[in-house]
Structures are given as C-alpha cells and as structure tokens.
C-alpha cells in the first residue's frame, strides 16, 4: 500500500518557516532593540537622567546628550536597557528644590575645554498600570 507524503510535508514546511523567524520573536522575555526616538524610551531616558542627578554626588547637573542604544524586555511591565551620553552642565545643584528633566536639559554647557562627558548604562523598570518607574541599575564612566 502506497501512502501520500502530503500530510507529513505540510507540517514540516511550517516548522521550517518558524525556524526562520527572527529569534527575538521566539524568545518570550528576550531583549528587543528599540528606536531611540520611541516615546517610551524617551520617558525612560528622562527618568534615568533625573535619577542619576538625584543619586550622584556631583556638584553640577548632568544632562542628556544623546541616547546611544535602547533595548527593552517584557517582564512584569517593561525593562529598558539604555546606553546614554551625559554632559556636565553649568547648573549647580542647589539645596532647594531639585531641577526636573526639562529644566536640566535647558542648562548651558561649559566651554569645550571644561566639558565632561559620561557614558552611562541604565536599566529602568516601568510598570505603567502602577504609574511607577524604578532605576534598577546604573553605571557611568
């Protein structure tokens, strides 16, 4: 008795097609590249700059120069992995109310010879339904 190979061939083709999909779509919770202009990335970056300035012992504010790279991961919410360049400003940290992100971004830069640039890696955990963001990791050099 001769059997048709058609029923076996269709599932095999489907399996091959699935194997050709990009790996990020097949790994739940895996890192995915994000556009640095994405509004969620911009929000996480602004939060990172504010937190950096709140936690650092620097006498002057540092502002965002640019977002070099952004990735995200779906967790209970979203985790953003950001590589950013920050630049020291002329705005001294006062003992009064700390500046917010938009105010920091308006701070002037010192003359070229006195500029200090940092490359920072931030991890930000966002849970929009709780209206909460948390800086889970930060390293700058």
From Swiss-Prot:
It comes from Micropechis ikaheca (New Guinean small-eyed snake). Coiled coil: none annotated. This is Cystatin. Residues 1-26 form the signal peptide. GO terms for cellular component: extracellular exosome. Disulfide bonds join 91-107, 120-140. Residues 29-129 form the Cystatin domain. A motif (Secondary area of contact) lies at residues 73-77. Negative results: the recombinant protein does not inhibit calpain-1 (CAPN1), a C2 family cysteine protease and legumain (LGMN), a C13 family cysteine protease. Does not provoke cell death (PC3 prostate cancer cells). Its main location: secreted. The record marks 29 as: Reactive site. It is found in: Secreted. It holds the Pfam family Cystatin. Belongs to the cystatin family. SMART domains: CY. One of its GO terms (molecular function) is cysteine-type endopeptidase inhibitor activity. InterPro entries: Cystatin_dom (IPR000010), Cystatin_sf (IPR046350), Prot_inh_cystat_CS (IPR018073). Inhibits various C1 cysteine proteases including cathepsin L, papain and cathepsin B. This protein has no toxic activity and its function in the venom is unknown. It may play a role as a housekeeping or regulatory protein. It comes from the Eukaryota. Keywords: Disulfide bond, Protease inhibitor, Secreted, Signal, Thiol protease inhibitor. Expressed at a low level by the venom gland (at protein level).
């Amino acid at each position: 008795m001769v059997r048709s190979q058609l029923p076996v061939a269709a599932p095999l083709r489907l399996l091959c097609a699935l194997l050709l999909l990009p790996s990020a779509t097949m790994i739940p919770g895996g890192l995915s590249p994000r556009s640095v202009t994405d509004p969620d990335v911009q929000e996480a970056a602004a939060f990172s700059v504010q937190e950096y300035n709140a936690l650092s012992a620097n006498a002057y504010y540092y502002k965002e120069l640019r977002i070099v790279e952004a990735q995200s991961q779906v967790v209970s919410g979203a985790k953003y992995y950001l590589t950013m360049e920050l630049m020291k400003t002329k705005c001294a940290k006062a003992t009064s109310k700390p500046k917010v992100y938009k105010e920091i971004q308006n701070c002037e830069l010192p003359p070229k010879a006195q500029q200090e640039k940092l490359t920072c890696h931030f991890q930000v955990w966002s849970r929009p339904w709780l209206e909460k963001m948390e800086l889970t990791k930060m390293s700058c050099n």
